[in-house]
């Protein structure tokens, strides 16, 4: 624990095109080696593909995809008396968003399509339909937490 003061979370500026803070955070998570304009091109390209493929609003689809990926519980390792238990704990809202975005980017990177924008768009479409590897990752995390429900009393 810090002895002085706890530093507050930095306010993130909304993205230039849609003026959405969540999308700006997503662009930052996708960014590699500080190349923000490249990350923006990829995300906006993916959203344009989403707009063409679906009659729904592209931002709405993005939000829906994230909703289907967000985990509500996860497991954390806790050492008790020489043995390590996987203790299920609830995920804080900020971490929920961060994990969902990270899993979406990882799943998109593993896909086989040619461009990253195409991969991201298809993964978002899959996630909004509750399928795809990002949603599978969430299911796995939830299953792991459910399997270790017996150790929930070790929560701290």
UniProtKB/Swiss-Prot annotation:
The keyword rRNA-binding applies. The keyword Protease does not apply. GO terms for cellular component: small ribosomal subunit. CDD domains: uS7_Bacteria (cd14869). SUPFAM superfamilies: Ribosomal protein S7. One of its GO terms (molecular function) is rRNA binding. HAMAP family: Ribosomal_uS7_B (MF_00480_B). Belongs to the universal ribosomal protein uS7 family. This is Small ribosomal subunit protein uS7. The lineage of its organism: Bacteria, Pseudomonadati, Pseudomonadota, Gammaproteobacteria, Alteromonadales. The gene is rpsG.
